[in-house]
């Protein structure tokens, strides 16, 4: 499996609360496609095995990769605990702590399938966000893309407008930003959901652009607590 080049510095930001079922799969999918990224886990008081599983992937600084090739399956992972959680507050906190300029926000129950950092970073020169295709998965079954999932087509779209929601549409299931943009235009920390849509509206008012690119792709797995799934039918 081809990975992105070693000299690309990137931080993944993953928000968690009791994500033991998928968090290991999510992290492994990142390591399979991106060389030694920084991964920031912004955790909202998980009470299951989420954080124990995360620690399986933490890089041991004493590990010599030349002597232990399996070290490629580890990376720099930091666990950040947040009080008074909201989606926007968690992202803003992770951005503040991120070491790298390129930031990927990914759901804890998404599996990264495709990413071309060279291409996406180039697109960030003309767009403040690149968000990607999501394939809805329920109990292993790929679902027909209805309701919110119908936005995730096979065509690139700049400044996507949702007729379903009657507003501009970005989805942080898998999305790439520059740190300096997110520091200048942080997410609304008071919103309990849809922080990405409100952010899109703010960006449009600033006469900036964002891009949907299906060549950035993730499988989005069903969870009982998943906000994207709560208002959707499973079939």
How should each PLM-predicted stretch be described?
Residues 103:
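Short aromatic/hydrophobic "clamp" motif used to bind/position activated sugar donors
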Residues 157-177, 192:
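A recurrent flexible, glycine/aromatic-enriched loop bordering the glycosyltransferase active site
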Residues 28-37:
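Short, acidic, metal-binding catalytic loop of nucleotide-sugar glycosyltransferases
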Residues 192-199:
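Acidic donor-binding loop at a coil-to-helix junction in glycosyltransferase catalytic cores
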Residues 69, 82-98, 119:
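Glycine-rich, basic loop-to-helix element that forms the pyrophosphate-binding segment
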Residues 29, 43-52, 110:
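A conserved acidic beta->alpha catalytic loop
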Residues 115-144:
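Conserved donor NDP-sugar-binding/catalytic core segment of glycosyltransferases
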Residues 206-231:
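Active-site donor/metal-binding and catalytic loop motifs
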